């Protein structure tokens, strides 16, 4: 395992338990109406809504004859997306993550919810997944690709394991799209993004235009992208408020150590970068060609 991948695995092995108060069995941001005041009581509904909005964006059908029969969640965290989709559609879901601790947690949640026959989880490398070509009717990833250095290979691997006609969904942090006259981000923008990435073990962030560019030569169709930045920013004040109470700070420190505290410190930078228009949160989807 490459050094960077090992660092990501250790980060999640050590800090996963710190975030359950905010996310439950999910490890991704929530989806809010712009301008909403986020609350702890509503955070669980918001993270589930993020999944549903992504599925809706990808035009996943509720029709029993058209809905997918199998799903792969790449970078599955502690299993929340698989568990939700398995319950929502009654289908078989598989998750893959680089963290053995996350697999252990995910399997525990599956057993608690009586879904151990519907979902399963593997420890593995997203750049070299142990699945045959064309295996899954839906391939999904949320807030995972940011950790990956070779994002283009990650996308090729998602397309490889998708069945013909399968929707492919990418939800992630990104940077703003460049204007036609720009060759790169401004130096000060790069500096801010590097600080954010270093604090939360992200490799780097690309733009939604990069995702579209990498997908275009592959055997996919109906590529589209959306900017959901305004739908996640309501969560930033909530996390900072709760994390900097004595109870919140000590809980994060005890359950997640310094890794968890660094994430909270990064959130302050993320909020400002989003306000400045540098940091984005995007959804990209397409379908594997038949």
UniProtKB/Swiss-Prot annotation:
pH effect summary: Optimum pH is 7.5.
Pfam family, one: Methyltransf_11
Pathway as given in its UniProt record: Alkaloid biosynthesis; vindoline biosynthesis
GO molecular function: N-methyltransferase activity; S-adenosylmethionine-dependent methyltransferase activity
Record-linked CDD domains: AdoMet_MTases (cd02440)
Keywords: Alkaloid metabolism, Membrane, Methyltransferase, S-adenosyl-L-methionine, Transferase, Vacuole
Region (SAM motif I): 71-80
EC number: 2.1.1.-
Listed PANTHER family: GERANYL DIPHOSPHATE 2-C-METHYLTRANSFERASE (PTHR44068:SF11), ZGC:194242 (PTHR44068)
Protein name from the UniProt record: Picrinine-N-methytransferase
Phylogenetic lineage: Eukaryota, Viridiplantae, Streptophyta, Embryophyta, Tracheophyta
